[in-house]
Design a protein with these regions (language model features):
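Oxyanion-hole/transition-state-stabilizing segment in secreted/luminal serine hydrolases
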Residues: 1-35, 40, 51, 55-61
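Catalytic His-Asp segment of secreted/periplasmic serine-dependent ester chemistry enzymes
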Residues: 57-148
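Hydrophobic alpha-helical packing residues
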Residues: 34-37, 41, 76-77, 125
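N-terminal cationic-hydrophobic initiation segments that often serve targeting/anchoring roles
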Residues: 4, 41-42, 78-81
Length: 148
């Protein structure tokens, strides 16, 4: 119970977990563990929105056979979303090139993202996350934050 320490000031929480389990556990087992974490967040931070991210693809291309299990897992993670407090987003496609390949600049080891991958991830996630944060300060034309 003390594993997840949250307070009521959290507006949103992003979960990206499960890739390290993909080799040893079934999609159902991994999704079940993530569902337990989502429930813990709901109990400890009842006002927080939870954005569950799809597990990123592995290998040199999005349609690489290694990703079959990841696609199955992501389908189960999508089912966790209720559209009220729990949301799902798959940013994996944003990491791929138009032909479906994943460049070494984005994922040098076919698993971990590098700076170009982080930038794509951020851009893909930004609109959804902004929609979950109704109380965030607005930008002014000078680029400074307007407190309200």
């Amino acid at each position: 119970d003390d594993i997840l320490q949250l307070d009521n000031t959290i507006q949103a929480l992003v979960l990206l977990i499960g890739t390290n389990n993909a080799g040893a556990f079934t999609s159902e087992e991994i999704a079940g563990g993530i569902q337990k974490l989502v429930k813990m967040v709901e109990e400890k931070a009842p006002e927080a929105k939870v954005l569950v991210l799809g597990v990123f693809p592995r290998g040199p291309a999005i349609n690489d056979p290694k990703n079959t299990r990841i696609h199955a897992l992501n389908a189960k993670l999508k089912d966790l979303a209720d559209g009220k407090r729990v949301f799902y987003l798959d940013v994996g496609p944003s990491l791929a090139e138009p032909d479906g390949s994943i460049s070494r600049e984005v994922m040098p080891d076919n698993l971990h993202v590098a700076l170009p991958g982080f930038l794509r991830w951020m851009e893909a996630m930004k609109p959804t996350l902004e929609g979950l944060l109704p109380n965030r300060p607005q930008e002014t034309t000078a680029g400074q934050q307007d407190p309200g």
